[in-house]
Amino acid sequence: MSADNSSLVPSFVVFQVGTRRVALPRDCVAELIASPILFSFPHTTPLITGVVLRRGRIVPVLDLGPGLLGAPSPQARFFLVVERRISNSSERCAIPVQGECELVAGILLPAAGEDDFVTGCLDLNEERIDVLDLEKAIAAGVRSEEQLISAAEALS
């Protein structure tokens, strides 16, 4: 019996948040949904831009823009539904994405940047794509959002 070598190479989902192309490991991505209705409501939770209904469930929408770009992401037509691992349980959330998403196989190279939420990078057709640690990227966004709120309060 021969081993299938393609299963040894990890897969990643490459997507775009604002102007930045990034990737997540394939195993934390559930699906890509197009044009769902985004329901907004008053709240104080950082990064949540609203919720979408998917398969009879309410899925919070988390914007990674503040952590990755320093500003909220532009409005999106597509949402990547991902599994967050929180303690011993998991929860689905949706991330607004711009442009195309693609599934790629590649070797995870060491991280070259300063961002603590980047676990490594992929070399995709001579383009360096950062691979994110989802929980650390969300935490970076929360910190960025809190800094923006503090700065706005200081100005008023």
Where is each model-derived feature located?
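An acidic, low-aromatic, low-complexity terminal/linker signal
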Residues: M1-S156
